[in-house]
Amino acid sequence: MNFSGKYQVQTQENYEAFMKAVGMPDDIIQKGKDIKGVSEIVQNGKHFKFIITAGSKVIQNEFTLGEECEMEFMTGEKIKAVVQQEGDNKLVTTFKGIKSVTEFNGDTVTSTMTKGDVVFKRVSKRI
């Protein structure tokens, strides 16, 4: 399955609680909670580029499945992680006590991030 495309956030659950759990300042949480960000994904074999635009903030991360890489987290912090593919439609990684699962189903992408007992879920649609 090729994951390439542009996707816009449609819904999100537990945004504020998750952002607080990862240390995001309250003023940034309030500014970002209603932004319907756009993610552009470019896949070339096992290599991926994610360009995430939320308001004026742009985060660009590149990785190759199964290889350690450095990525920018939503807090602006640089993290090291290894992204794995599970089955035909899931990208999974764990970093700093956070498990991230991105699942592709047709034109819908469901991203779930879990830290402790706080689960943040974001659903995006292809645009």
UniProtKB/Swiss-Prot annotation:
One of its GO terms (cellular component) is nucleus. InterPro entries: Calycin (IPR012674), Fatty_acid-bd (IPR000463), ILBP (IPR031259). The modification Phosphoserine is found at S39, S56, S100. There is a cross-link at N105-G106 (Isoaspartyl glycine isopeptide (Asn-Gly)). Pfam families: Lipocalin_7. Deamidation and transpeptidation at the beta carboxyl of Asn-105 forms an isoaspartyl residue and Edman degradation appears as though blocked. This rearrangement gives rise to an extra negative charge carried by the acid form. Its main location: cytoplasm. The modification N6-succinyllysine is found at K31, K36, K46, K57, K78, K90, K121. It comes from the Eukaryota. The modification Deamidated asparagine is found at N105. Forms a beta-barrel structure that accommodates hydrophobic ligands in its interior. Belongs to the calycin superfamily. Fatty-acid binding protein (FABP) family. Monomer. This is Fatty acid-binding protein, liver. The lineage of its organism: Eukaryota, Metazoa, Chordata, Craniata, Vertebrata.
